[in-house]
């Protein structure tokens, strides 16, 4: 019985081990590839739990999301013979899920070593070999990452379509200490020169600002003067218009008054012409004589009542009036 129990226990253990080796998990953002007897199977699997034949089938999980591959301490010899080292180069890339099988089949699951690491080493050495230290370290350093990205992506499009390079980041290379000090001194001098240039620009900017302020102030004064001048001109024009209106009104009033006076005089003259007839004048004459309380003496008194042609006789009668008055006064004195 004990022997049979041991056999049963061994069988259960084997079954448990087989189940344990058959069940596996693929993480999110990964693709599972399978090997049987060392041969890559065409079957791939996505995230989750999966089953496979125990003991004879194995799997590897290949990342298909963004990942960063680091290449460290890359040597590089410049055209001048100076050996420099790039401490760290980071390549951000991702693998398209549909291309996982072909990439793994052609370059194994560690495809990044064959396709990325080696290409970075090759491109950096090519770049350094045709440029001197000044160009690599300072002048062209900002172009290295972009050039590496373009060269790497172009090579991958031919050899392994499905790998996308998103970015390449290159750290400043390490250079010999003596050369580094010289570069530091040179950078210090450049910094001083830049500071001096910036100070000069600041002074020029301040002068330009002052000039613009003066121009703005002058323009403001000119605009104010122009506004005042226009205001005065408008006031004078307004006064002129008011004066013209007043003159026009005065002329109109005077003309109206003259027209009225002329009309009145004309009407009066017309009325007098119609009124002062010879008969009416004769009547007025008689009324005036009748209203006179004085007594006239003389032989020509009757002639006063003649027509206007007897004018001289009337005058002589008047003279007689005066003489008679004188005689009257003399007679009074004698008495």
UniProtKB/Swiss-Prot annotation:
Task: Output the InterPro entries linked to this UniProt entry.
Answer: Band_7, Erlin1/2
Offer one Pfam family short name for this entry: Band_7
Which residues carry attached sugars according to the database record? Answer: 106
Keyword Transmembrane present in the record's keywords: the answer is yes
* GO cellular component: a single term: endoplasmic reticulum membrane
The residues that cross the membrane are 3-23
- Keywords per UniProt: Cholesterol metabolism, Endoplasmic reticulum, Glycoprotein, Lipid metabolism, Membrane, Signal-anchor, Steroid metabolism, Sterol metabolism, Transmembrane, Transmembrane helix
Q: Which residues lie on this side of the membrane: Lumenal?
A: 24-335
Could you tell me one molecular function GO term of this UniProt entry?
Answer: cholesterol binding
Q: What membrane topology was assigned to this protein in its record?
A: Single-pass type II membrane protein
- Tell me the residue ranges located in the Cytoplasmic compartment per UniProt: 1-2
Give compartment(s): Endoplasmic reticulum membrane
Coiled coil, from the record: none
- The lineage's top-level taxon is Eukaryota
* Gene Ontology biological process terms from the UniProt entry: cholesterol metabolic process; SREBP signaling pathway
Question: What does it do?
Answer: Mediates the endoplasmic reticulum-associated degradation (ERAD) of inositol 1,4,5-trisphosphate receptors (IP3Rs). Promotes sterol-accelerated ERAD of HMGCR. Involved in regulation of cellular cholesterol homeostasis by regulation the SREBP signaling pathway.
| Family, similarity comment | Belongs to the band 7/mec-2 family.
The protein in question is named Erlin-2-A
């Amino acid at each position: 019985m004990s022997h049979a129990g041991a056999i049963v226990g061994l069988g259960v253990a084997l079954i448990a081990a087989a189940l344990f080796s058959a069940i596996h998990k693929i993480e999110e953002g990964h693709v599972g590839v399978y090997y049987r007897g060392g041969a890559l199977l065409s079957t791939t699997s996505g995230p989750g739990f999966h089953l496979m034949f125990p003991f004879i089938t194995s799997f590897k999980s290949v990342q298909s999301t963004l990942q960063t591959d680091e290449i460290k301490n890359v040597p590089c010899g410049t055209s001048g013979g100076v050996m420099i080292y790039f401490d760290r180069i980071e390549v951000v890339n991702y693998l398209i899920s549909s291309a996982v099988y072909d990439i793994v089949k052609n370059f194994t699951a560690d495809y990044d070593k064959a396709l990325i690491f080696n290409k970075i080493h090759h491109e950096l050495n090519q770049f350094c070999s045709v440029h001197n230290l000044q160009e690599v370290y300072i002048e062209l350093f900002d172009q290295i990452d972009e050039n590496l990205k373009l060269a790497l992506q172009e090579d991958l499009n031919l050899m392994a379509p499905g790998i996308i390079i998103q970015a390449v980041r290159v750290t400043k290379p390490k250079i010999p200490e003596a050369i580094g000090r010289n570069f530091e001194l040179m950078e210090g001098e450049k910094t001083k020169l830049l500071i001096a240039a910036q100070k000069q620009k600041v002074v020029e900017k301040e002068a330009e600002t002052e000039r613009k302020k003066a121009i703005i102030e002058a323009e403001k004064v000119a605009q104010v003067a122009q506004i005042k001048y226009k205001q005065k001109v408008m006031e004078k024009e307004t006064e002129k218009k008011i004066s013209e209106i007043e003159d026009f009104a005065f002329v109109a009033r005077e003309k109206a008054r003259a027209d009225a006076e002329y009309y009145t005089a004309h009407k009066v003259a017309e009325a007098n012409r119609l009124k002062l007839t010879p008969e009416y004048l004769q009547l007025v004459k008689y009324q005036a004589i009748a209203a006179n309380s004085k007594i006239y003496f003389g032989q020509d008194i009757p002639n006063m009542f003649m027509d206007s042609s007897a004018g001289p006789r009337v005058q002589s009668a008047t003279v007689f009036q005066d003489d008679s008055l004188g005689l009257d006064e003399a007679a009074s004195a004698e008495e």
